[in-house]
């Protein structure tokens, strides 16, 4: 059987859907040779590669209402709505330990997408030889809500700005068949934003401004390519089967739990698809 890659969309706390899907995969013993994630999708996938079932849900259940995790106070004091040092420092190192040894020893090729602020182009980081927590922080640093992250001589932000759905990248890496986990329901399309906020905040980085203001177009183009591949049998797309109307900063633990449970159910159903078996 031809190897399949795994492509994971971001979406901040909508990523609890992805957490449920990946836990369903862990329960079934399903692994992939290639995983590429964007923003929250990459962060959540780490616990899949490290085989820590349920870790993503425990983090959100425990800390969603902790101001260190997400609060206006964070934004006013650090420039980031989400507490990035808490999420990518205290939690994995001390509070809900991440299994670095299993993650690093995994044969899975794990790729995280970031955006180069100065070029307005995506940058792809493998897990080997990198400070992966800093890369994850950069990939999840949403424009307007997070400061720019410096790493390896680059200025980085949210990978979703330049490659929200890295289908084309997976093809370039030799994976013609892929499982794609989306955090939006069927039929979703992005709309063009107003152009002035990006110009006002990031005017010194014109290529980034262009990326922010055209993200809607690249997202919709990538989604159309994925749906075409799905129709042709080259992609298995797992997306929310019910639209629970979850926001990026959802505060209801009950709704986030429902989203996680939906992901587990949809993931388990996806495993029954014959495209997994040929």
Please provide the spans of the model-predicted regions:
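Patatin-like phospholipase
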Residues: 1-38, 46-278
């Amino acid at each position: 059987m031809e190897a399949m890659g795994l492509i994971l969309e971001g979406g901040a706390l909508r990523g609890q859907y992805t957490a449920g899907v990946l836990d369903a995969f862990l329960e079934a013993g399903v692994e992939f040779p290639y995983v590429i994630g964007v923003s929250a999708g990459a962060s959540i996938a780490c616990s899949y590669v490290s085989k820590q079932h349920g870790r993503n849900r425990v983090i959100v259940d425990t800390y969603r209402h902790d101001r260190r995790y997400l609060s206006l106070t964070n934004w006013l004091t650090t420039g980031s709505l989400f507490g990035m040092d808490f999420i990518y420092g205290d939690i994995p190192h001390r509070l809900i330990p991440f299994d670095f040894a299993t993650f690093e020893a995994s044969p899975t090729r794990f790729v995280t997408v970031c955006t180069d602020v100065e070029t307005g182009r995506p940058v792809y980081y493998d897990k080997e030889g990198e400070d992966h927590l800093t890369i994850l922080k950069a990939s999840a640093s949403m424009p307007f809500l997070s400061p720019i992250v410096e790493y390896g001589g680059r200025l980085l932000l949210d990978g979703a700005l330049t490659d929200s759905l890295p289908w084309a990248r997976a093809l370039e890496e030799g994976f013609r068949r892929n499982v794609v986990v989306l955090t939006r329901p069927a039929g979703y399309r992005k709309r063009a934003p107003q152009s002035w906020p990006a110009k006002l905040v990031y005017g010194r980085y014109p290529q980034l401004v262009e990326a922010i203001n055209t993200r809607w177009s690249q997202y919709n183009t990538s989604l159309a390519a994925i749906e075409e591949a799905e129709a042709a049998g080259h992609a298995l797309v797992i997306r929310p089967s019910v639209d629970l109307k979850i926001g990026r900063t959802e505060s209801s633990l009950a709704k986030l739990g429902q989203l996680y449970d939906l992901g587990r159910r949809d993931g388990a159903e996806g495993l029954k698809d014959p495209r997994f078996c040929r």
